[in-house]
Design a protein with these regions (language model features):
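Gly/Pro-rich, tryptophan- and cysteine-flecked surface segments typical
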Residues: 1-335
Length: 335
């Protein structure tokens, strides 16, 4: 299911976020990571205001508190809480960040992020978050991810073949759009570097820059990487080529989950897609992607499908090809 939000000047959607736990085993498998939600941009400035929504599960809750820790661009934090005398079954919780009186000054007119602990019960807390322009003409929505920064969940990169990526992310440059990668301090602590590569139409790989971002294990601020600007300064952009981030652990401990924000943007809010790097777990990595989704077509809207495929074996692409099949559905039939 896609939840689609439309304004006068924009449209944003997010796929299904929260769900009811199926049984006790489902609760047991997810309870350790379910409480703290994070991994998204927040804004509270002269142009944009963010919001957070969540839904309670099937049980009534009494005398509980919601806790949230906000981080600004400097990595500084402040904590807030809200007390609820009662939360009904399936009740929606809606938070406008402008209701936190200290927050606007604290964020210093720049982007930040937060970690929120919800008092909900028996529901998987992948919550809906987003940002409105102050005139409500533009909107961007995404969903949260769980906070893994207090867990020690690693892959030993000594066991990974040197001809394979430890961790990587193929992506496309779309004409007319900027692209940011936003890295949040929400994964198991590690010292890592991010490099940038390019695959051309002949499937040849070249390194654009070995290190576009260094991340130290104790960082607390956002790391915002403007990929299009970096490619422009180092190389001529070719929209038909596939670009790839090469993530390397400096201490042989690679977080088993590496989540980030994917911001395609023009002059307005970014897409802030919650996405994960492809981590080499030592087994076959299947093709990934969204296999369904709405297509918009009007005088003001168009849909772009961007596909990229890179093997964990760095030179395998030379001898590898993929067949892509697509069906486009209208209201009553396949177009």
């Amino acid at each position: 299911i896609d939840a689609i939000y439309e304004t006068k000047e924009g449209i944003s959607l997010v796929h299904s976020n929260q769900r009811i736990f199926e049984n006790f085993q489902d609760i047991k498998n997810n309870e350790s990571i379910n409480k703290t939600q994070t991994g998204f941009d927040i804004h509270l400035d002269s142009k944009n205001e963010s919001f957070i929504t969540a839904i309670n599960g099937p049980e009534e809750i009494k005398n509980k508190e919601l806790y949230v820790e906000f981080f600004n661009y400097l990595g500084k934090s402040i904590k807030e809480k809200i007390r609820y005398d009662k939360i009904n079954p399936y009740q929606a919780i809606f938070l406008e960040l402008k209701s936190f009186k200290r927050l606007r000054k604290f964020l210093k007119n720049k982007r930040g992020f937060c970690k929120i602990n919800l008092p909900t019960k028996n529901i998987f807390n992948r919550i809906l978050v987003g940002t409105f322009s102050k005139d409500k003409k533009k909107i961007s929505t995404t969903h949260s991810y769980y906070d893994c920064s207090k867990f020690s969940d690693y892959i030993n990169t000594k066991n990974i073949d040197k001809n394979q990526y430890q961790c990587y992310l193929p992506f496309n440059i779309i004409e007319g759009l900027d692209l940011e990668i936003v890295i949040y301090p929400i994964f198991s602590r590690s010292n890592i570097t991010v490099g940038l590569e390019e695959y051309n139409l002949d499937r040849r790989r070249k390194t654009i820059k070995n290190n576009i971002q260094t991340i130290k294990k104790n960082f607390n601020d956002l790391k915002i990487i403007n990929l299009k600007n970096i490619i422009k300064t180092q190389n001529k952009i070719n929209k038909n080529n596939v670009y790839c981030l090469n993530i390397v652990s400096k201490n042989n401990l690679l977080p088993s989950r590496l989540t980030f924000g994917f911001n395609y943007k023009k002059t307005s809010l970014g897409s802030n897609i919650s996405e994960s790097m492809i981590v080499n777990h030592g087994k076959d990595i299947k093709g990934r992607g969204f296999y369904w989704g709405p297509a918009f077509c009007s005088k003001k809207l168009k849909t772009i499908i961007a596909l990229s495929s890179v093997s964990k074996n760095k030179d395998e692409l030379k001898n590898n090809s993929k067949l892509v099949k697509m069906k486009l559905y209208g209201k009553d039939k396949v177009i």
